[in-house]
């Protein structure tokens, strides 16, 4: 399911048009993104937790030349599903 399909599904469940449902979905994504940018965790009970995780610096290899390179430390968004979500997926 892509973003457009998600908007259509949410709008259908709310009984509104896609045009009316789109801003709600957009605002949820924007709010989660802003929270992660500011270093906050976003926990949704029964669904999961979005957070930013630190990736340590490491050595890598250039696949074309085989030369060893340094890969700097970075931050990456991560999602940890809640037990209820895991159980719901397993039950299908």
UniProtKB/Swiss-Prot annotation:
One of its GO terms (molecular function) is DNA binding. The modification Phosphothreonine is found at residue 4. It comes from the Bacteria. PROSITE patterns: HISTONE_LIKE. GO terms for biological process: chromosome condensation. GO terms for cellular component: cytosol. Residues 55-77 are annotated as: Disordered. Transmembrane segments: none annotated. Belongs to the bacterial histone-like protein family. Histone-like DNA-binding protein which is capable of wrapping DNA to stabilize it, and thus to prevent its denaturation under extreme environmental conditions. This is SPbeta prophage-derived DNA-binding protein HU 2. The lineage of its organism: Bacteria, Bacillati, Bacillota, Bacilli, Bacillales.
